[in-house]
Amino acid sequence: MLKIAICDDEQPIREYLKRLVKKCTEGEIRLFVDGGELLADPTAFDLILLDISLNREQNAAEPDGMETARKIRERSDALIIFVTALREYVFEGYDVGAFHYLLKPIDEQKFTEVMDRAICQIRSKKNVEPLVIKVGGNYVRIPVDDILYCLLYTSDAA
């Protein structure tokens, strides 16, 4: 089951995004009002829909969407889809490893396409089989994500 976070400071937008997500997939969907609330949640989300302009005018003490994304990146590889009316931050959004950038008002067909691609990527990442190697007389399973470098030695004298 996918774990999805929706973080937008506008309640109608959060609810609208939740409805759109439910049309695309099943999963645990959590709603957040600001970046601080999202960052405080210990859940390991698979996908985060994040408004860039969070708290720009209401509460400067909380991180905006871009700062929230930077902090998420420090601890998680969750896919981030920015949902915003601000075109000028598109390149900065990709600097923090955003999966996609959707502009408000949201085109439902485009939203569905982006969600389908995101879900496919998340599922393919989760379905990677571990590498099984023989060490001595035992077989060891190593998650592919844990492999940094691999060197093969063979006993062939040829």
Regions found by a protein language model. Give the residues of each.
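CheY-like receiver
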Residues: G27, F45-D146
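Acidic, metal-coordinating helix/loop segments flanking the phosphotransfer/catalytic sites
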Residues: K18, L31-L47
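Non-catalytic signal-transmission and effector/linker regions of two-component phosphorelay proteins
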Residues: M1-K3
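Alpha-helical elements of the RecA-like P-loop NTPase motor core of helicases
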Residues: E15, A40, F91
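Conserved small/polar residues in nucleotide/adenosyl-binding loops
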Residues: Y153-A158
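Two-component/phosphorelay signaling modules centered on CheY-like receiver
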Residues: E10-F32
